[in-house]
Amino acid sequence: MITVIFAAVLLVAFLGGLAHFLQRGLGDMSAALKQFGMFMLTKAPAGIIDLFKDDDGNGAKTWIQFGCFWFVISAIGGFLGAWHEYDAKALDSLASIGWSWENGDAMTLFNLTTLSAAVFSILLGGALVAHSRANGGRLASEANASLMAFGWFNVTLLSLVLPIFIEMGDFHYSLIGMVYAAMVSSMLVNSLLTNAQTDSPTGVSSWFLIMGLAAMIFGLAIDALGEITNQTTVVWMADAIVRGWVPLALMFSVGYHVVPKVTGHPIWSGSLTKASMLLLFVTVTPFFLSQSSTEPLLQSVGAILVTMGMFPILAFSVNMICTMRGDAGSVVHSPGAVAAIAAALLLPLFAVLAFFTGLNVMVGDASLASVATTVNMGYLYTIGGLFCLAVMFELYPLASGNRLAGTSAGLATWLVIFGG
């Protein structure tokens, strides 16, 4: 119990310190740190960074493109998984080329890995578009952002291939997580330097992006430490951060940019915006909960934090819907905005379902474990998918400098809404 309290104090100090210096600046050290940060982004690793273009929007565009690749792969995997749930002997005729089907655990891991990579990559790309648009129109280093996207893609691919050759455990995945943490650290430095390009106040989307990346670095780091020291409560805390806070932070970053941009009206309520931002990073989201601890006190505290974790979700949804009311006609004619609003409407529903099933799992009762898994995957496919469509239809054209090529964007949005 002492370890998880210590980790929580460190987390609050880390995020609080970052928020303080982001708001107040670093004083006389600012110029030197900017220079050092730019050197690390543009000169290291030597030679490799020169392979990527430093054009405006290229970093975000690369993240979104790699995310789209994983999105298609995860959709295929999801279809195969659903097919085998319906017919366990499906595709047995492919056994001659190595196809085999046991209990579906490998397919579940494959789908979760590819879908998580898709949602994270696309949402991060969208958040980078919003962040750069608010700070001079480009990232501090577009080439470095592209390099990190390429590295993320390859590490994810490696994590899918390695289990074929060696037996992978939680410790091995935590080491891969540390590689992810190093790449996210580079993206955080890039985002901070981008934020320092102008003297304007930090925007809402930028806040969610920066705090989400910082929380992810901390979560991946303590996950590795928890696995090494066998501290299960610390690992649980890390999972709550990486699987709970980070996706929602990126979703909020995208939503708070897309809807006001399309409607032409500012965010409806500053108070709800601050509530969704503050409460997200001090509570536990109801998604992807696992068994926390056998200690009654920790279970009680966890249940309270999960209950409070509903408030930032509700605050965000209400804020988005009320912002849309300023110009609903513009939203209807924008497939990206329709996707963002639909996600904001459906998010509380998935949160309520995840709340009841997740609490059941968190206290060690496995009676609703399969339902919780279905809800969590549905959350990623539907809510994550809709926000990804919002990025692809509204923000990707800004990064690429092109318009949508076809008219099927609206149909795709409605198919995800009704089909999940």
Question: Residue locations for each model-derived region?
Answer:
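Membrane-embedded alpha-helical bundles that constitute the cytochrome b-like, heme-associated redox core
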Residues: 49-58, 82-97
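Inter-helical turn/loop segments and adjacent helix faces that build the functional surface
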Residues: 194-201, 261-265, 326-329
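Long amphipathic alpha-helical scaffold segments
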Residues: 46-58, 62, 326, 330-331
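Membrane-interface helix termini and inter-helical loops of multi-pass transporters
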Residues: 228-233, 295, 363-367
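Short helix/strand-bridging catalytic loops that position acidic/His residues to coordinate divalent metals
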Residues: 232, 369, 399-404
